Structure formats: structure tokens, C-alpha cells
């Protein structure tokens, strides 16, 4: 199993440029529904407090700590609300782009982010993954870029098995992929990511499942109860 033993080795692999794409463009519909049913003030899940910051700020900071080439945040629904909360703190560190139109699938958001980058590889993250640590992201990058064929390899946070995978079922972000190759699969798609990842797998790409550092790394914040679990 791949695992980073010496992070100084990463500098060897960074001749292949890497960007981070963070998607923050969703409808927030399940969280809003839960907040309404509980009589809680409506607040976008990405700007809920977490570890003395907000959810999205924690995710961004984890990505920035990797010192990779660039960080791009893709906004869509509630773009103004999110930017009002975080823009001043990140305007010099992050490139913000906005979907137009906003009512598009996750694949479009990711494509728009990738198309605004010039890197060789992309670390693709959703903004509601603040518990995925920089260590896990580093493992993904190291596995991707030290593999025998980096441009035919995707390293991804595991959902079931770890190591080399025999299926892409159930997989999603975060993952590291060759940027231009991934864009070819996303172009003209308006869908969730798993069907596209399955197509990539069927075309012969090798997928490597990275083990989580702890259980919370596998938790996305879709419902209010998910958010409460993160605070435990």
C-alpha cells in the first residue's frame, strides 16, 4: 500500500504542477430543509462555524497548507453569501470563479474550475469536506505522481477498499487526477461525478483508494445531523 513516509520526497514529484479545485456551488437544499424543520436560522452549510472558522475556510486552509501551485474555488448558488463571508480573507490566495448559469451539475462546476487552471494535475475537493486532513491530501498527490503511469492514475479517498481498486462504484471527491485528461471526460457532461468516474475506470485508468486518517474524513455535510457529527 502506498503511504507517504517522508514528505520531503514530495518536492521531487512537484515538477508536475498541481492545482486544487474546490467546488462550492451547490444548492444547499438538504441543509436548508433541515434548518427549516428545526426552526434554525437559514445559513449556508459552507459558512457554518467549524474549528474557529467556517466549514469552507477550513477546507481552503487545508488545501493551502499543501503549498501547491494554485487554489481555485468554484461558486454558483449562494455565491454572494459565501463570498461576503470569506472573500476578504482569501482574495490574494485563492482564485474565485462563478458558474454561469448557476443551475448546473457537479461535473460542470468541476470542469469550470479545471478550465481556469493550467496545471498538470488537479486535487479535486468539495468545500464541505473540512475534516479531510492535509496529510490525506498529500498521500493522494504522492500516490498519483509516484505511480508508474501518473497520467493514467487517479488516487482517491476510499469508500470501501484501499489500494488498487477493482471498481469505481460509490467513489467521489476528493481525488487527484491528470487535469486535461479529466477535462475530456467532463466536457459536455452535466451530471454527478460517480457515473463519470465509472466511465474513466472502464476506459482503463487505474484507481488507488487512499485510507482515511479517521472516520470523519469520510463524512460530507449534507444534512444538519452531519454537521453535528463533525462537531462531536
Predicted regions and their residues:
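Conserved N-terminal catalytic core of the sugar/cofactor nucleotidyltransferase
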Residues: 2-4, 12-13, 55-121, 135, ...
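N-terminal nucleotide-binding beta1-loop-alpha1 segment
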Residues: 16-40
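Structural beta-sheet core signal
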Residues: 20-22, 72-73, 123-124, 156
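Short glycine-rich anion-binding loops that position phosphate/pyrophosphate groups of nucleotides
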Residues: 26-29, 78, 101-102, 127-130
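Short catalytic helix/loop segments, enriched in acidic residues and glycine
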Residues: 37-58
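Conserved beta-strand segments of alpha/beta enzyme cores
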Residues: 46, 93-95, 206-208
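Short beta-strand-to-loop acidic/aromatic patch adjacent to the donor-nucleotide binding site
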Residues: 120-128
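Conserved core of the sugar-phosphate nucleotidyltransferase
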Residues: 131-225
Amino acid at each position: 500500500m502506498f503511504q507517504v513516509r517522508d514528505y520531503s520526497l514530495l518536492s521531487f514529484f512537484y515538477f508536475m504542477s498541481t492545482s486544487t479545485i474546490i467546488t462550492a456551488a451547490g444548492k444547499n437544499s438538504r441543509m436548508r430543509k433541515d434548518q427549516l424543520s428545526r426552526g434554525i436560522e437559514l445559513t449556508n452549510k459552507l459558512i457554518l462555524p467549524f474549528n474557529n472558522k467556517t466549514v469552507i475556510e477550513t477546507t481552503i486552509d487545508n488545501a493551502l497548507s499543501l503549498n501547491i501551485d494554485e487554489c481555485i474555488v468554484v461558486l454558483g448558488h449562494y455565491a454572494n453569501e459565501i463570498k461576503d463571508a470569506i472573500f476578504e480573507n482569501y482574495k490574494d490566495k485563492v482564485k474565485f470563479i462563478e458558474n454561469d448559469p448557476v443551475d448546473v451539475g457537479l461535473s460542470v462546476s468541476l470542469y469550470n474550475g479545471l478550465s481556469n487552471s493550467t496545471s498538470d494535475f488537479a486535487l479535486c475537493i468539495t468545500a464541505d469536506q473540512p475534516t479531510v486532513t492535509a496529510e490525506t491530501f498529500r498521500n493522494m498527490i504522492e500516490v498519483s505522481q509516484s505511480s508508474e503511469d501518473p497520467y493514467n492514475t487517479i488516487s482517491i479517498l476510499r469508500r470501501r477498499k484501499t489500494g488498487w481498486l477493482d471498481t469505481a462504484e460509490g467513489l467521489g471527491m476528493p481525488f487527484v487526477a491528470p487535469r486535461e485528461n479529466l477535462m475530456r471526460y467532463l466536457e459536455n457532461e452535466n451530471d454527478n461525478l460517480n457515473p463519470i468516474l465509472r466511465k474513466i475506470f472502464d476506459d482503463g485508468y487505474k484507481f488507488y483508494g487512499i485510507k482515511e486518517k479517521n472516520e470523519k474524513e469520510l463524512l460530507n455535510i449534507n444534512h444538519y445531523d452531519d454537521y453535528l457529527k463533525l462537531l462531536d
